[in-house]
Amino acid sequence: MAKLTKRMRVIREKVDATKQYDINEAISLLKELATAKFVESVDVAVNLGIDARKSDQNVRGATVLPHGTGRSVRVAVFTQGANAEAAKAAGAELVGMEDLAEQIKKGEMNFDVVIASPDAMRVVGQLGQVLGPRGLMPNPKVGTVTPNVAEAVKNAKAGQVRYRNDKNGIIHTTIGKVDFDADKLKENLEALLVALKKAKPTQAKGVYIKKVSISTTMGAGVAVDQSGLTATVAN
């Protein structure tokens, strides 16, 4: 417990909670303060100017980060026939239909992403109570229900992140690892923000991207000054 207290004291000394930092300074701070014994993820929280109580203002989607997430992703695909062969060729670890569903019902969940072709949803639909609570249920809005399962597998392997606002209108996702080059983290963040802007609900009024904070797995959030990001990202 003493180590945690010391770590938090150092973070409080270094990070001004009232300040918005230039993106490069923010990333440097994260790297300096990342003292865990494992390579921490760099996470982002984006406060959106939406009314999350209204379904037509909710933001959900997926985008492939230019430099990936640094995670090794295991993919399960529900499909059959030529699509099954294409999914395997694209790198999917698990491919099947009823047989794969039976594995999952038995508690065998050795995967991070589930993809399904539309004709397989009759099988996947039976797994809603298992996959849903884990955020693994395939959904066309994030590209995981698609006739082109091979492309979806490649996207998942390439570092695709899925995003969905919480009840407070905040998006939480990852943009890489703390050992990534600063430029790569910045470009991943900018790619995410561009995707979020494209997903802006037409009903959302006023400032859309209200606040951007980045943090490491074990660290505190550092607010980012959006004016230091690429012009296409700025509000």
Curated annotation (Swiss-Prot):
Query: Which CDD domains is this protein grouped with?
Result: Ribosomal_L1
Which Gene Ontology cellular component annotation is one that this UniProt entry carries? cytosolic large ribosomal subunit
Pfam families per UniProt: Ribosomal_L1 (PF00687)
By its UniProt entry, which InterPro entries does this protein fall under?
Answer: Ribosom_uL1_bac-type (IPR005878), Ribosomal_uL1 (IPR002143), Ribosomal_uL1-like (IPR023674), Ribosomal_uL1/biogenesis (IPR028364), Ribosomal_uL1_3-a/b-sand (IPR016095), Ribosomal_uL1_CS (IPR023673)
- Gene Ontology terms, MF aspect: rRNA binding; structural constituent of ribosome; tRNA binding
The GO biological-process annotations, alphabetized, read as: regulation of translation; translation
Q: Which UniProt keywords apply?
A: Repressor, Ribonucleoprotein, Ribosomal protein, RNA-binding, rRNA-binding, Translation regulation, tRNA-binding
| Signal sequence, start to end | none
What binding partners and quaternary form does the record give?
Part of the 50S ribosomal subunit.
Q: Which NCBIfam families does the record match to this protein?
A: rplA_bact (TIGR01169)
* Family affiliation: Belongs to the universal ribosomal protein uL1 family.
Q: What does this protein do?
A: Binds directly to 23S rRNA. The L1 stalk is quite mobile in the ribosome, and is involved in E site tRNA release.
* Name under which the protein is recorded: Large ribosomal subunit protein uL1
What species does this protein belong to?
Answer: Citrobacter koseri (strain ATCC BAA-895 / CDC 4225-83 / SGSC4696)
